[in-house]
Amino acid sequence: MENNRAGRPKSCRRVKEMPKVRCFKPQGIPGIKLEEMVLSVDEMESLRLADLEGLYQSEAARRMDVSRQTFGRIIDSAHRKVADAIIHGKSIVIEGGVVMKREEQVHNAKPGCVCQHCGHEESHRSGLPCRDMICPECGHHMIRKGGCGTGQEDI
């Protein structure tokens, strides 16, 4: 059950890397017949930190640059979504979330634009926002390097 309340916008969450695989589906069921469960990029990162790396929530929260309470809400949501998808035979699509790759906040000396889909980088052009640029490699929208992106593939 999703809460669509108005309130503060989500703060930027730090992730180690964008997902290399964006969809998982049950074997033997055509994709067209499957219901999708969308797991945000920050929810995937919370699973990586807590379940794969075995970090305590306080350390995982520090790495994602969120409060421990916020991390708890993110990981709880991720666990519910993954369990629902596995139990009910849904595909898992990884996209969305307000995220920034961790190293970009430190190593972003030169302004530029980056494609979150394929990683292609271009110099920033004055007067043209990165979000309005299309990646010449894959055709997806680009974001400002070091800025918060949506983790969303533009279709």
From Swiss-Prot:
InterPro entries, per database record: UPF0251
Disulphides: none
Segments passing through the bilayer: none
Family the UniProt entry places it in: Belongs to the UPF0251 family.
PANTHER family: PTHR37478, UPF0251 PROTEIN TK0562
Name of the protein: UPF0251 protein Paes_1249
